[in-house]
Amino acid sequence: MVSARSKFASANFDRAKKPEGGRVAAAAVVEPSLVEAVQRAKTRLDTLDYYPEPVRVDRVRIRVAPWFFRIPGFRRYHGYAFWRTILLRSADVPDDLVTHELCHIWQGQHRALHMAWKHMTTRYRSNPYEIEARRAVAETRRPAAQPGL
């Protein structure tokens, strides 16, 4: 027997799934170009010897999720890395940002608890993992082509 409440909830759920026009807003969008950007970032990080093993990207996801960056506390960021997921504010980001965020995933693959501790106890600019990620980007950045050459 189905209660009136569950019928009402079911009807509201069905309406919520299909807004007017039949489209459902995606929580996060996957861009094929970003998957390629992760591979380019891995190639860059593989030239470094910060950790005993290279970064593993087989389970890394990258998503465009502008809604995440509207949350107070995250508004100043353009990218954010979780354990295996990189969230980006928009799809048109430089490879340096993807490399920076992938470096955080690499750090987490080797020092997850220490990373979490430092994140809670250290300011952003002086966090050793942020410093290391910025250094990784700088050390792997290609020199800009000089005009006329």
Indicate where each model-derived feature is located.
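Short pre-active-site segment immediately N-terminal to the catalytic Zn-binding motif
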Residues: 78-98
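Active-site recognition of the HExxH zinc-binding catalytic motif
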Residues: 96, 100-108
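Peri-catalytic and regulatory segments of divalent metal-dependent proteins
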Residues: 48-54, 77-84
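Post-HEXXH active-site segment of zinc metalloproteases
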Residues: 71-74, 82, 92, 107-135, ...
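Pan-zinc metallopeptidase signature
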Residues: 2-3, 140-142
